[in-house]
């Protein structure tokens, strides 16, 4: 077997052990290493989009909620209480409501954190302004 050098990511943490091993038809073992990604690299790559999860969940939650309403309405229009389709409709309906509620909760927490940061920065500005004029 011949060993080929692997290309490593600069600045990224190195994977201590190979992650995936595949066998080719010629009885050769191909080792694929997957680099670990840090939170800083993720933020740099996504532009901070991982902190806006509540914005991504809203459209998905609305679609799931509407689907749940439709499936539940169809199931109960045929008087099939307790059937698989009615249970599926209720699960979709409750999942949509849960996703909408969690999105609203995340939005409220984020707004509260923004207010706190804004208040802290205003306090720091006022303190700096007083020290300049004192």
Swiss-Prot record:
> Which PANTHER family does UniProt cross-reference here?
PHOSPHOINOSITIDE-INTERACTING PROTEIN FAMILY MEMBER (PTHR16100), TRANSMEMBRANE PROTEIN 100 (PTHR16100:SF5)
Instruction: Point out the gene that encodes the protein.
Output: Tmem100
Residues of the region (Disordered) are 1-24
| Superkingdom in the source lineage | Eukaryota
Cite the InterPro entries for this sequence: TMEM100 (IPR032536)
Q: How is the protein disposed in the membrane?
A: Multi-pass membrane protein
For this UniProt record, give its keywords in alphabetical order, as a comma-separated list. Answer: Cell membrane, Cytoplasm, Developmental protein, Differentiation, Endoplasmic reticulum, Membrane, Phosphoprotein, Transmembrane, Transmembrane helix
Q: Which GO terms describe its biological process?
A: angiogenesis; arterial endothelial cell differentiation; BMP signaling pathway; cellular response to BMP stimulus; endocardial cushion development; epithelial to mesenchymal transition involved in endocardial cushion formation; in utero embryonic development; Notch signaling pathway
Q: Tell me the protein's name.
A: Transmembrane protein 100
Subunit structure, as described in the record? Interacts (via C-terminus) with TRPA1 and TRPV1. Interacts with TASOR.
Its biological purpose is as follows: Plays a role during embryonic arterial endothelium differentiation and vascular morphogenesis through the ACVRL1 receptor-dependent signaling pathway upon stimulation by bone morphogenetic proteins, such as GDF2/BMP9 and BMP10. Involved in the regulation of nociception, acting as a modulator of the interaction between TRPA1 and TRPV1, two molecular sensors and mediators of pain signals in dorsal root ganglia (DRG) neurons.
């Amino acid at each position: 077997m011949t060993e080929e050098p692997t290309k490593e990511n600069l600045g990224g943490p190195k994977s201590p052990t190979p992650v995936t091993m595949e066998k080719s038809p010629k009885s050769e073992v191909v080792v694929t290493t997957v680099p670990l990604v840090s939170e800083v690299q993720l933020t740099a790559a996504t532009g901070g989009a991982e902190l806006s999860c509540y914005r991504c969940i809203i459209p998905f939650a609305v679609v799931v909620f509407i689907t749940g309403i439709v499936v539940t309405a169809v199931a109960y229009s045929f008087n099939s209480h307790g059937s698989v389709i009615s249970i599926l409709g209720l699960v979709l309906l409750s999942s949509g409501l849960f996703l909408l509620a969690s999105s609203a909760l995340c939005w409220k927490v984020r707004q509260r954190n923004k207010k706190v940061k804004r208040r802290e920065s205003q306090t720091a500005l006022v303190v700096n302004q007083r020290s300049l004029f004192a």
